[in-house]
Design a protein with these regions (language model features):
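Primary mode marks residue(s) on the alpha4-beta5-alpha5 output face of response regulator receiver
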Residues: 1-47, 51-163, 170-183
């Protein structure tokens, strides 16, 4: 998963005993494409299939400027960020996603600020940072042990992917590997 452009903060009230800065971005599914403007910029169709959320214009040629000028599927209409993940496939066909919920959490007793325009990040190790759950009414009923261990959801259960990104940022908007500026 990757992201670009600038998220806009929305305050979330937390319990008094656990103060920390946080904001949440909720975005509906936008589109599917074999593009990745961070890993393969300007190279249309060079990536594996991705499912995009948030910015509706995201493609291999996306720039900060093009993202800022486009519309969004996010609940916060000023959030022009682009979020994408590899497409989940069943029998060679992509599974239609519903939404992406992105949480930005600060350290305890610290504030959270919006990331700057042009911020880019790719998660470095999919298996080390990804797990799956089956959920009913937002409550996990099953949980995987890693990215390759996808549980079988039944009945009213919905499959949910969870991707954890690095959390200590050095202030740069990008790095040559798109990961080392956040550890």
């Amino acid at each position: 998963p990757t992201l670009a452009a600038t998220p806009v903060a929305r305050a979330v009230k937390l319990l008094p005993e656990a103060p920390r800065g946080i904001f949440v971005v909720g975005c509906r599914f936008s589109h599917t494409a074999s593009d990745d403007p961070i890993v393969h910029p300007g190279m249309t169709g060079m990536s594996h299939l991705h499912q995009f959320f948030g910015n509706t214009s995201t493609n291999a040629n996306s720039t900060t400027e093009s993202l800022l000028g486009a519309s969004t599927t996010c609940g916060e209409k000023n959030d022009k960020s682009a979020y994408w993940v590899p497409a989940l496939m069943v029998n060679g066909q992509p599974v239609a996603p519903i939404r992406a919920s992105v949480y930005y959490r600060g350290a305890k007793n610290k504030s959270v600020r919006a990331l700057p325009n042009g911020f880019k990040l790719v998660t470095p190790r999919g298996d080390a940072t990804t797990f799956w759950t089956c959920k009913v009414g937002g409550v996990a009923t099953k949980r995987s042990t890693g990215a390759g261990d996808v549980p079988t959801c039944t009945g009213d259960e919905q499959l949910s992917a969870h991707v954890r990104f690095q959390s200590c940022w050095n202030g740069a908007t990008d790095s040559s590997d798109h990961t080392s500026h956040v550890v």
